[in-house]
Structures are given as C-alpha cells and as structure tokens.
Amino acid sequence: VTRAASSAASVALFPARPEDALEAAFEICRRLRDFNDRREEAGEYPVRIGIGIHTGQIMLGTIGENQRMDTTVIGDTVNLSSRIEGLTKAFGVTVLVSEDTVDRMGTRDRFRHMGRVRVVGREEGVDVYEALDAPATSTLETDPKVRWVNREAFEMGVQQFAAGRMDDAYRVFKKLYHDEPTDRAVIAYLKRIIYYRKKGLPDPWDGIFRVASK
C-alpha cells in the first residue's frame, strides 16, 4: 500500500502479476465477510466496499523534505484505477477490472463484461469487467451463481445496448431483472435503456454507458 487516495480509499501496487492484485482483492472480500457476519449477528448493516484494478505504467517517487518524506505514485493508470473503483458503486459490484488487466491474465472466463463505460474526467470509454468469482462480502449480495448462469445473456444485452438496439436490450435486461431483481448492474442498464427509449439516442451514438459521478 503506497498511500491513501482519499479519506476512504487506498492505493496498492502489484508489480509482478495482475493475478496478485485480484487475489489480494479476494482476500479483502473474505476478511470483510467475516466482519460483516459479526455485524449481522449484532443486528447491524453490513459494510460494502469497491475495488478497482487496472494495469499500466506509473511513476513512483519520493516527495517532501527532510522533516517529512512520502513515497507516492502518479499517472493515468492510478487515476483510471480510482475511476474504475468508483464504478463499483454505479453497478453494485465489489471488484471491477479493466480490459487491459483482463488481457494480461489471458482469459475472460471468470469475468462478466460490463460494457464500455465513460467515467468522469475522461473523454474516451473504457471496457470494464466484473470478477465473478469474488467472494461475497455479506449475505445481502446477489448470489454469484446467478451471475455466472446469466453472464452470457447479460453480455448479449450489453452488446445490444452498444449497438443502439434499445428495444432488444430492454427485453434482455427485463428478463434478467425478473430472474434476479437484486442485480444492480441489470437495474443500472434498465434505467439507462428506459431513458433512451423515451428521450431518444444521442446523435451520433457511440455505445458508451455514461456515469455522471465518481
């Protein structure tokens, strides 16, 4: 862990393999599940977290003066990781991974493609993926088995959305919502599709899911 990115977030580096970052994220989920189980037994609400993982070049250095020195990292990779972490709230998932990271791992079998998303502060979109085998952090989360089963249909709905076929996308996500009404990613897409069906698509349409907040 190199530094706190904000009052509620930290930045960690994994120089060897992207799988190391993913396994660290899973271990955080497992530890949080133990903590949340105790909270639920005490009648308290579980704590939720979001983890964003991206792979790329960074600048690492030491700043400050003799009285206080601090090692920190800067660069677009760091910023995008933070933005991806912010997307976990919009989609209601725990671990989101960039396409660059998924490609480095060499397989997409364990991920659900969430679409091409434009985050605050960036002009271009970025493809992000949910880590489907991330351990549940509380009993209130959607059953991961359901997401595995519905992954193909979800990704088909994302493709229809990206192609601008909102009626087809609506039918796909409506059925997914019927099958699992607690999947917040499905709800997020349904809300956006309903809006576009009512207001019409922007011209030109770029197929990007836009998120208004960090």
Model regions and ranges:
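Conserved helix-loop-beta segment at the catalytic/binding core of cyclic-nucleotide signaling proteins
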Residues: 1-15
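A short glycine-enriched loop-to-beta-strand structural element that forms part of the catalytic core
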Residues: 8, 45-61
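Alpha-helical scaffold within the catalytic cores of cyclic-nucleotide enzymes
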Residues: 12-51, 76-89, 110
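Helical mechanochemical/support elements of P-loop NTPase systems and associated helical scaffolds
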Residues: 17-20, 24, 59, 65, ...
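Cytosolic regulatory/linker segments at or just downstream of nucleotide-handling modules
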Residues: 58-60, 88-166, 174-175, 180-185, ...
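Intrinsically disordered, low-complexity, charge-biased linker/tail regions
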Residues: 202-214
